[in-house]
UniProtKB/Swiss-Prot annotation:
Pfam families: UDPGP
Name of the gene encoding the protein in the UniProt record: Uap1
Main location, first listed in the record: cytoplasm
Enzyme Commission code(s) on record: 2.7.4.-, 2.7.7.83, 2.7.7.23
Function (record text): Catalyzes the last step in biosynthesis of uridine diphosphate-N-acetylglucosamine (UDP-GlcNAc) by converting UTP and glucosamine 1-phosphate (GlcNAc-1-P) to the sugar nucleotide. Also converts UTP and galactosamine 1-phosphate (GalNAc-1-P) into uridine diphosphate-N-acetylgalactosamine (UDP-GalNAc). In addition to its role in metabolism, acts as a regulator of innate immunity in response to virus infection. Regulates innate immunity by catalyzing pyrophosphorylation of IRF3 phosphorylated at 'Ser-386' by TBK1, promoting IRF3 dimerization and activation, leading to type I interferon responses.
Keyword Cytoplasm: yes
Taxonomic lineage: Eukaryota, Metazoa, Chordata, Craniata, Vertebrata
Pathway field: Nucleotide-sugar biosynthesis; UDP-N-acetyl-alpha-D-glucosamine biosynthesis; UDP-N-acetyl-alpha-D-glucosamine from N-acetyl-alpha-D-glucosamine 1-phosphate: step 1/1
Name used for this protein in its record: UDP-N-acetylhexosamine pyrophosphorylase
BP term (GO), one: UDP-N-acetylglucosamine biosynthetic process
Organism: Mus musculus (Mouse)
């Protein structure tokens, strides 16, 4: 260990405080800290900090972006409800691409389930479905089913490779989970794990924070760290070697995600796009989601906090919100575009500043848990690269068909939790049964008066205000119904199981057939 050399580097960067407890450390602790610090480029970190804080200060004092915003023009927008006559063509295009082994999916799975009250990766979470499948298993089975559908339509076996970006904290447990479950039926060589980078937390004056005497406080560098990670681990080269042309990028916490959605992929390809965003219609002006729009003519996501209430409330002539393209971290990239981002544009991306309460060791060596923000974490966002697209498109889908994020524990505010995720999936599957000609009956044999949401699968323009308003039983809970992704990817192919049949809930349809679970032993 060349400690003097390290001391000099730290001194030049104004970070010499990181060795203030050096003489108190055991030899093993010294080695640990030395290795951690040796791996850091302090000049680069200081530069990141200066730029991030400069941008943060500028945006804090700037007016809102309202005057510079324009909504997504109709010509770059595809809609699952307003473009029904084209859905079949888009789906056929997507399935054709999949059948030629040209499509891969990229999962952003770096998040731990901290807000869910668990210490393991979010993808390993079970929201309490009758099958008790985890998010990872549901997504894996959707990939398997889509491979089968493409094969059925085109007659040749195909593969959808699955690239999974984890963080340092979730990598090992994620890999172990997949190994334990035999990759959920997927071939091991087609599931590629890679790790996003980490950045140290810094105080407001640019000093790297120690969380222990021998340990720097580190945090993942945001889902936009994807691009740096792709470069560091040669992932784009792997995609090229496999002949991949299109990538579907999505976030692990959406239980309804249509992984490698052939309609979305087909739409983007037929539009000649190099980059696309899937969005849901924002119907409530105060919903805290970012919106996809143009600012100064350039596509980007504008966060809810960046626009005034008056702008958020503006409506177009058809009554919809003017800025209604709600971002759901669900994107399409071509591989050449991704390659350009990784090799050319990534260094131009700005870090965003998140002010945080960061536990630290003070100069006396005491561990402090602050009660107000004392520093920043720097992160990039996956959507920051929209600005570099040559042809950007937006695909709007129904929230109740495709978006129910899992962010909070059930004990929290009643939104985006295991119960809402479970209910969203069961409501959707209930619709599928009704649309395929099945019926539900109560314990007396009377048909339940549930009307299917006709909007499912883009069959009507009717959009309901409350996702589950007519799909609940007397206890205001959706009818329990779960259909395995191995049976149906998006509601197709169910007629043989349910047409003209009556079912008691709970109903499960899986590869072993149709099961009506008996409640309370009756």
């Amino acid at each position: 260990m060349n400690v003097n050399d390290l001391k000099q580097r730290l001194s030049q960067a104004g970070q010499e405080h990181l060795l203030q407890f050096w003489n108190e450390l055991s030899e093993a602790q010294q080695v640990e800290l030395y290795m951690e610090l040796q791996a850091m480029n302090f000049e680069e970190l200081n530069s990141f900090f200066r730029k991030a804080i400069g941008e943060f200060d500028r945006s804090s004092h700037q007016e809102k972006v309202d005057a510079r915003m324009e909504p997504v023009p109709r010509q770059v927008l595809g809609s699952a409800t307003r473009d029904q006559e084209q859905l079949q063509a888009w789906e056929s295009e997507g399935l054709s691409q999949i059948s030629q082994n040209k499509v891969a999916v990229l999962l952003l799975a770096g998040g731990q389930g901290t807000r869910l009250g668990v210490s393991y990766p979010k993808g390993m979470y079970d929201v309490g479905l009758p099958s008790h499948k985890t998010l990872f298993q549901i997504q894996a089975e959707r990939i398997l089913k889509l491979q089968q559908l493409a094969e059925k339509h085109h007659g040749n076996k195909c593969t959808i490779p699955w690239y999974i970006m984890t963080s340092g904290r979730t990598m090992e447990s994620t890999k172990e989970f997949f190994t334990k479950h035999k990759f959920f039926g997927l071939k091991k060589e087609n599931v590629v794990f890679f790790q996003q980078g980490m950045l140290p937390a810094m105080s407001f004056d640019g000093k790297i924070i120690l969380e222990e005497k021998n340990k720097v406080s580190m945090a993942p560098d945001g889902n936009g760290g994807l691009y740096r990670a792709l470069a560091a681990q040669n992932i784009v080269e792997d995609m090229e070697q496999r002949g991949i042309c299109s990538i579907h990028v999505y976030c692990v916490d959406n239980i309804l995600v249509k992984v490698a959605d052939p309609r979305f992929i087909g739409f983007c390809i037929q539009k000649g796009a190099d980059c696309g965003a899937k969005v849901v219609e924002k119907t409530n002006p105060t919903e805290p989601v970012g919106v996809v729009c143009r600012v100064d003519g350039v596509y980007q996501v504008v966060e809810y906090s960046e626009i005034s209430l008056a702008t958020a409330q503006r409506r177009s002539s058809d009554g919809r919100l003017l800025f209604n393209a709600g971002n759901i971290a669900n994107h399409f990239f071509t591989v050449p575009f991704l390659k350009d981002v990784v090799n050319v544009y990534e260094p131009q991306l700005q870090h965003h500043v998140a002010q945080k309460k960061i536990p630290y060791v003070d100069s006396q060596g005491y561990f402090i848990k602050p009660d107000k923000p004392n520093g920043i974490k720097m992160e990039k966002f996956v959507f920051d690269i929209f600005q570099f697209a040559k042809k950007f498109v937006v695909y709007e889908v129904l929230r109740e068909d495709e978006f129910s994020p899992l962010k909070n524990a059930d004990s929290q505010n009643g939104k985006d939790n295991p119960t809402t995720a479970r209910h969203a999936l069961m409501s959707l599957h209930h619709c599928w049964v009704l649309n395929a000609g099945g019926h539900f009956i109560d314990e007396n044999g009377s048909r339940l008066p549930a009307i299917p949401r006709s909007a499912t699968n883009g069959k009507s323009e009717a959009i309901t205000a409350d996702v589950n308003h007519n799909l609940k039983d007397a206890n205001d809970v959706p009818i329990q119904c779960e259909i395995s992704p191995l049976i149906s990817y998006a509601g197709e192919g169910l007629e043989g199981y349910v047409a003209d049949k009556e079912f008691h809930a709970p109903l499960i349809i899986d590869e072993n057939g149709v099961h009506e679970l008996v409640k309370n032993g009756i």
